[in-house]
Amino acid sequence: DVERSRGLGDVYKRQLYNWTDSPWKGQGYLDYIMQNFYTNEPDGIIGNEDCGQMSAWYVMSALGFYQVSPGIPVYTLGRPMVNKASMHVKGGIFEILVKNNSAANKYIKEVKLNGKILDTLFISHTDIIKGGKLEFIMTDQPVK
């Protein structure tokens, strides 16, 4: 129940759908949480901010990836909120591009890493720090 996602450390659970046969469900929930529970109002962050944990979750999720288990260098991919972002990393620049991004297009149709279509919704920490390009193609229909 998304409405119960008002507690500290609970919002990340939507990324766990990537380990099921229904990752599109998590993408829909992520969109709902980021659109409704994070605003620029005084009470715009759900639950307890806990020294930045909730903000960090939002920033990473809005970029389209999140490390569910600290210490394990794997990131799960989800519904990005940005159209474009870049990060300076050890290997140069890691660029995130999101095509067809809109309020209606909240589902991932395809993801490419450095031009290669991914067959999974996971990337490694090494993929990020080497630099390169992560490209999301979004759609308004769940990809089942």
Regions found by a protein language model. Give the residues of each.
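Single conserved hydrophobic/aromatic residue that forms the stacking wall/gate
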Residues: 1-12
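Non-catalytic C-terminal accessory modules of carbohydrate-active enzymes
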Residues: 10-144
